[in-house]
Every structure is written in C-alpha cells, then in structure tokens.
Amino acid sequence: VNFVSGIKSCITVPDDLKDGLFMAEEYISGQEYSIESISFNDRHDIIQITEKVTTGAPHFVELEHHQPAHLSPSIEKKIRNIIPPILSSVNFSNGASHIEIKVNDQGDVYLIEVNPRGGGDYISNDLVSLSTDYDYLKQMILVALGEYNPVAVHHVAYAGIYFLSAYTKRLLPYFNIPLANWMVRRERKTGELTVSSSNYDRDGFIIYCSDKKIVL
C-alpha cells in the first residue's frame, strides 16, 4: 500500500508487474470514528460511538480511543440514521458489529469498513461497559442464544484508552506514578519504545474512566 499525494510521490512499477491489477482509492481526510452496534433478527441497535486518533498515513496505527465521541447533535443523528441501512445492505442480521467511518470538515460521512464483530483494542470488552450501563458482552451472548431483548443505553461516564509507542512517549510519566483514581488499568512492555507500523506492535496502554474526558 502506497500513499500518493502528488506526482512526486508516485511510484515506478517494475516491468514484471505492469500486467498486474492495481487499485487506486481516494484518501478520505477527516476525523475517524467507530460505531459499536448489535443486531438481532434484522434490528440494529447502536450502543456507542468511539472517537479515534491514529498516526495517519501510511500505517494508521491507532493511538487513542474515546467514548462517547465528541459530536454535534446533527452529525450524531446523521451517523445513527445511516448505520442501520448499511448493516441491512450487507445482509447482517445477528451479532455485534464494528463500523468505521470518517467525517470531513463539511460534515460528510464516509464509510471506511464494516466488521461483523465487536470492536477490538478493549473497545467491546472494557470501554463500552465503562462509558455506558450496557453489558455489551452479555448482550452478544443473548443474541447467540436467541434471547436478546433491546434495552435502553445510558451514558454514565467518559472512558478511553491511550496506547504507548514511540509516537506517544509523552505517556511515559503516567506509567511511573501511583495509580490515579481515573486509571482503570495500565500495562507496559519492557524495552525501547517501538515506532509502530501496525496495531500489533504497540508497547502498552492506559485505560481511563472519569466524569470527563481525560486528556494526556
């Protein structure tokens, strides 16, 4: 995968690959979000919206997740209105889903990908249960058992996660102080910090929960 922003960043294709297939896609700029949903018998319930921070091109390593996302009422309404039709259009009927989108400065919403699973990076198994009164994992099991009944979801706190890597070395002091009251959990690998090129080579994390968004 190559990120091309102009003529100077174009690449030369080797002769032995010139008969191959290539795909060029527009790069969508804007703020990234993920929508955590659950579906049962073609009904789609949005549980939470996660605001995401990444390294950007070319690797888009995820550095932060925050719930609930900071959105204007109109943008949140737009997101909540488009997600059910997206899931229905791909015939997704039952189970958890994790949908990634971007919203540009004009308020346009772009679909990035649809995942037929709960969100990783502690989104499904930690952040949702911290930021809402909704037991996401329990509801996934009830869907599998055919016993799911929709329940109201209420915002109860701000929750998020910061990932440690060479990109976020500013976080290091928070691993060397006593556990603060807003810290739910923290872990760190030993050794030098990694210049991460994927979500699989980060060096640690801090999960928080508070009555406000924690900015580190």
Model-derived features: where do they sit?
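Conserved anion/nucleotide-ligand pocket segment
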Residues: 1-2
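His/Asp/Glu-rich metal-coordinating catalytic cores
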Residues: 19
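ATP-dependent carboxylate/phosphate-activation module, predominantly the ATP-grasp catalytic core
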Residues: 26-32, 36-92, 96, 115-144
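Short acidic-glycine loop/turn motifs at beta-strand connectors
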Residues: 39-43, 103-107, 166-167
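A short glycine-rich, hydrophobically flanked beta-strand micro-motif that places a catalytic Asp/Glu
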Residues: 93-105
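Peripheral (often C-terminal) accessory segments that flank ATP-dependent C-N-forming ligase machineries
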Residues: 139-216
